[in-house]
């Protein structure tokens, strides 16, 4: 069985510039999620041993295209157990993340994992994203949460539009998305994750970006 350090090489072969603090945080994710997943199931039991490939690296595909400055405000819509926001918060320690989910026990896992590995830049909120009215964000992110039409309906009103900035929605999706994109009424940019990470798992997985 591979050690956590060996599994982490899957991440570091694509991202070589992590600080020692970030590497410690990434290494700690496996133990933290295994401990909490045994109490509150946020990652399928058969998937937990593939945490770094299926969840951490998948989440970090957003980091491969994002150039976020210090102070950028990001909302994770339907964050579940913390993907993509937890790996992204490690990658961007000076970016502020709001992790939103309608299921409180999932946010309990996010809070616990953040405390265990020392993530300071995620705030959780037990609510539905459509009920957030008085706060604006630079970006919304999500992974396998809802159809693109709904995601943009929720995200569009709370995204700041800035000149010469690609502010908007970035979501991770898989499979044949042509009908979903057609029904969304928006014109997103669609990128193959397999073009970024040459792992078989990503062959039919995509980054969908909608600019405000």
What are the residue ranges of the model-derived segments?
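Conserved beta-strand signature within the Rossmann-like core of class I S-adenosyl-L-methionine
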Residues: 163-176
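Active-site capping/gating segments
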Residues: 176-212
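A generic alpha-to-beta junction signature in SAM-dependent methyltransferases
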Residues: 66, 159-163
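Class I SAM-dependent transferase core
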Residues: 1-70, 75, 105-120
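Conserved beta-strand segments of alpha/beta enzyme cores
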Residues: 96, 121-123, 168, 189-192
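Conserved SAM/SAH cofactor-binding pocket of Class I
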Residues: 60-142
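A short SAM/SAH-binding and catalytic strip from SAM-dependent methyltransferases
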Residues: 139-152, 156-157
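Short amphipathic alpha-helical segments
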Residues: 111, 152-156, 182-183
């Amino acid at each position: 069985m591979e050690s956590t350090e060996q599994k982490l090489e899957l991440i570091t072969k694509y991202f070589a510039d992590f600080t020692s603090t970030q590497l410690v945080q990434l290494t700690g994710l496996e133990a933290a999620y295994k401990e909490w997943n045994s109490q509150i199931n946020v990652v399928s039991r058969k998937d937990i041993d593939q945490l770094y490939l299926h969840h951490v690296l998948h989440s970090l595909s957003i980091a491969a295209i994002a150039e976020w400055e210090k102070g950028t405000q990001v909302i994770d819509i339907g964050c579940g157990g913390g993907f993509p926001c937890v790996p992204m918060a490690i990658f961007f320690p000076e970016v502020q993340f709001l992790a939103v989910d309608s299921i409180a026990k999932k946010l309990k896992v996010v809070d616990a994992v953040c405390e265990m590995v020392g993530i300071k830049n995620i705030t959780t909120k037990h609510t539905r994203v459509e009920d957030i009215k008085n706060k604006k964000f630079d970006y919304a992110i999500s992974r396998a949460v809802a159809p693109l039409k709904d995601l943009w309906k929720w995200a569009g009103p709370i995204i700041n539009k800035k000149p010469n900035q690609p502010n908007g929605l970035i979501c991770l999706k898989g499979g044949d998305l042509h009908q979903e994109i057609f029904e969304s009424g928006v014109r997103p940019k669609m990128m193959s994750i397999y073009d970024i990470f040459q792992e078989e798992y990503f062959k039919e997985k995509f980054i969908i970006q909608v600019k405000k």
